[in-house]
Amino acid sequence: MRTLHGRKFLVLGLLAAAQAGAQDLGPWPQHSMDRPKPAIIDPGPPPSDAIVLFNGHDLSNWRNADSADKPALWKVENGYIEVAPHTGNIATKQLFGDCQLHIEWATPAKVEGEGQERGNSGVFMAGKYEIQVLDSYDNPTYADGQAASMFGQYPPLVNASRKPGEWQTYDVIWHGPRFDASGKLTRPARITVFHNGILVQDNVTLSGPTAFKKRPPYTNDPVKMPLALQDHEFPVRFRNIWIRELAN
């Protein structure tokens, strides 16, 4: 895509690869409102080797997440994708393994609802591991469900959310799980996330796929899986989506 919007991408590859910290899930029950909340802070063009997943004009690289035979039905206008409520999640036609992802998103400028009912969506790495998208600007909710959380597992290190309606960025380094020939897990998934240029997930090890109010075990999936975006029935917008495949 030649006419992408937004701030110039901050080069993250070496920095993210160097992150080796591990966060503890801690003693709190999942989605506990008593869990300490993160501190609130004030928070270009793709590389030549990137695969541009949204060209600003159509959804030719996307399909319905539930069926490869169904098209993606979200709205496209003014260089962005907007969730069309009740049409279902969308997924990339191309499959990806370990990767670097850049994606920009914005929740509705008009504030409606509270908690999880305000600008909710999600970015699913390998179709199963959710980075939460939410309007988390002056909007209390459980820590492991706010924007930039690994939903149901890790809160972000800080709340770097911008105001509703403003464009925000996620820059992600993803290393998916690995299994041996018998299907036994040999390497859990790890992820590093920058929200608006701020480190919020520091090479965390995931306990398994995302699920609501439970933590299911890993399943023996292929190394390469689609990237998916969530229809949570809110008109969240996405743009400037690109990915770089990393050596396994």
Q: What residues fall within each predicted segment?
A:
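Hydrophobic h-region of N-terminal signal peptides that target proteins for export
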Residues: G13-A22
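Carbohydrate-interacting regions of secretory-pathway proteins
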Residues: G21-N248
